[in-house]
């Protein structure tokens, strides 16, 4: 990927983004053997200022970078030494920052770019980033209450704060007998919930019947669930992917779920776990939580987990809370605050109605984990028993800072601004007869495609015509993403229909970026159709 056109060169012609300043080189980084300086306050302050300036200038000039790099595999490995230096390099930190600028930044996909529309957001904020820095600087390992009492209790406070901000059922909060924790991703969350459900069920029916357990999802459920099922020992053939259809806006049908569960019961199998999704990755479809919970309850108390990784953030807005109607009956729910709530990667909050099931499945009692006398006689939370890892990060600190500094109203405004921009983009699509919106927009994702010429004439395309229409849209996406300083979008194939995805959610995205993106789409469509005659 070529650097922005306004770049100038340094170091004998190496390209450099003019927005990012030269790095100070007046003091060398202390040698690792000089332990007195490894965490020297003055050195930390000096280098820290350089990093803050570097990041600030990166954000200031981010709009000048192509969103996605045009590089080939091995491009970076060829430019870096095969071995780490045996001794500190001269001016090592400054040299490393220059390499970040000149070698690494040109080869990353700029997820914070205002023109990044390909994926659900990995939202950043000043407070979120500085909260990460603060947690890294304090660097505690809060696996038990005794290991870091304040970190544990802040996490308990934060998950209840966040749960109330999202209007979750009281039964999922510590205040209501449930509880929550902050993990890295929804992949971890669904795995932990599945293991808890598995062990609870096997305690009831016997461990020998693990081969009879069956789990359920839709064909739109994130692949992380299938991976979690394999890790948990569920055979591939016992993971039921229930087909969805366009008539149901790609949501999981309660009727189809009941039929699948009943067929398994009739075959002597044991329904175990349902993963419902609120805001699927491909189209943001919303599974009907209340109705699915009712089906699960009819089949021996199947554990219901709601994956709201993306759309869960929208629950801060009252107008979206209907999407989890019936959630008081779920066993667990997870959402990624790093996707849309300004908390920076990584930050997945998960709540469970019965924490005891989680602790029973994941708890440990090793002697080397020291207990604090102050905790004796108290019902403390040891978060090592709520996840798969012992070492864990102090993620609650940044979430606490985000909630304090932006407030729930600030988060609502943030989400609503993106929803409004998505609505504007949707209106632009509908205003051009050459295009169609393929799936209903619920949040800030617009799924659309270019109609083939027969479709625009009202003629059915048939199987062969559908294939041609899909190829037409594949070409359109390639052309859109190839545009210099243009938008970066992605695709989905749902119900045999290939569509473009425009996911609006970058903290830096403004209305002008959305209008410019649509202009590029229109121009590329015009060019493609003209060439086709």
UniProtKB/Swiss-Prot annotation:
Q: Which GO terms describe its cellular component?
A: cytoplasm
Cofactor dependency: pyridoxal 5'-phosphate
Indicate the enzyme's highest-level EC class: lyase
Does Lyase show up as a keyword for this record? yes
Alphabetized UniProt keyword annotations: Decarboxylase, Lyase, Pyridoxal phosphate
Biological process GO annotation list? Answer: amino acid metabolic process; carboxylic acid metabolic process; tyramine biosynthetic process
Database matches in InterPro entries: Aromatic_deC, PyrdxlP-dep_de-COase, PyrdxlP-dep_Trfase, PyrdxlP-dep_Trfase_major, PyrdxlP-dep_Trfase_small
- Does the record carry Phosphoprotein as a key word? no
Q: Which family does it belong to?
A: Belongs to the group II decarboxylase family.
The name under which this protein is listed is Tyrosine decarboxylase
As recorded in Swiss-Prot or TrEMBL, the protein's gene is named TYDC
């Amino acid at each position: 990927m070529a650097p922005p056109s306004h770049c100038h060169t340094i170091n004998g012609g190496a390209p450099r983004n003019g927005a990012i300043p030269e790095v100070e080189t007046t003091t060398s980084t202390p040698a690792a053997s000089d332990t007195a300086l490894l965490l020297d306050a003055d050195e930390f302050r000096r280098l820290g200022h350089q990093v803050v300036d570097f990041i600030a200038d990166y954000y200031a000039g981010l709009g000048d970078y192509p969103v996605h790099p045009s590089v080939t595999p091995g491009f970076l490995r060829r430019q870096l030494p095969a071995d780490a230096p045996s001794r500190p390099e001269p001016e090592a930190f400054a040299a490393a920052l220059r390499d970040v600028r000149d070698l690494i930044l040109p080869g990353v996909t700029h997820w914070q770019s205002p023109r990044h529309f390909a994926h659900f957001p990995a939202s950043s904020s000043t407070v979120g980033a500085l909260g990460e820095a603060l947690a890294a600087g304090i660097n505690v390992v809060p696996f038990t209450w005794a290991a870091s009492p304040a970190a544990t209790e802040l996490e308990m406070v934060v998950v209840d704060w966040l749960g109330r901000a999202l209007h979750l059922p009281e039964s999922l909060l510590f205040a209501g007998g449930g509880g929550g924790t902050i993990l890295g991703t929804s992949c971890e969350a669904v795995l932990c919930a599945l293991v808890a459900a598995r062990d609870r069920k096997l305690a009831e029916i016997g461990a020998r019947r693990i081969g009879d357990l069956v789990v359920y999802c839709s064909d739109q459920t994130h692949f992380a669930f299938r991976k979690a099922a394999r890790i948990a020992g569920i055979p591939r053939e016992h993971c039921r992917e229930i087909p969805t259809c366009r008539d149901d806006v790609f949501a999981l049908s309660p009727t189809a779920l009941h039929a699948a569960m009943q067929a398994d019961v009739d075959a002597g199998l044991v329904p175990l776990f349902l993963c419902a999704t609120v805001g699927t990755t491909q189209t943001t479809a919303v599974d009907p939580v209340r109705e699915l919970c009712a089906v699960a309850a009819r089949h021996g108390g199947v554990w219901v987990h709601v994956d709201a990784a993306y759309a869960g953030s929208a629950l801060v807005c009252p107008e979206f809370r209907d999407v989890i109607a019936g959630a008081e009956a779920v066993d667990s729910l997870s959402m990624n605050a790093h996707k849309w709530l300004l908390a920076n990667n990584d930050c997945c909050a998960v709540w469970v109605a019965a924490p005891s099931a989680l602790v029973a499945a994941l708890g440990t009692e090793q002697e080397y984990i020291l207990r604090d006398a102050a905790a004796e006689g108290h019902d403390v939370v040891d978060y090592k028993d709520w996840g798969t890892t012992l070492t864990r990060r102090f993620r609650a600190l940044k979430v606490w800072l985000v909630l304090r500094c932006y407030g729930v109203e600030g988060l609502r405004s943030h989400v609503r601004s993106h929803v409004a921009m998505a609505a504007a983009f949707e209106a632009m699509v509908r205003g051009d007869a050459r295009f169609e919106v393929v799936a209903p927009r619920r949040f800030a994702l617009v799924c659309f495609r270019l109609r083939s010429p027969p479709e625009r004439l009202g003629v059915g395309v048939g199987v062969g015509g559908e294939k041609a229409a899909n190829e037409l849209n594949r070409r359109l996406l390639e052309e859109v993403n190839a545009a210099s300083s243009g938008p970066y979008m992605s695709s989905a194939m749902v119900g045999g229909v290939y569509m473009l995805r425009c996911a609006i959610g970058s903290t830096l995205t403004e209305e002008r970026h959305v209008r410019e993106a649509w202009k590029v789409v229109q121009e590329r469509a015009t060019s493609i159709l003209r060439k086709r005659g």
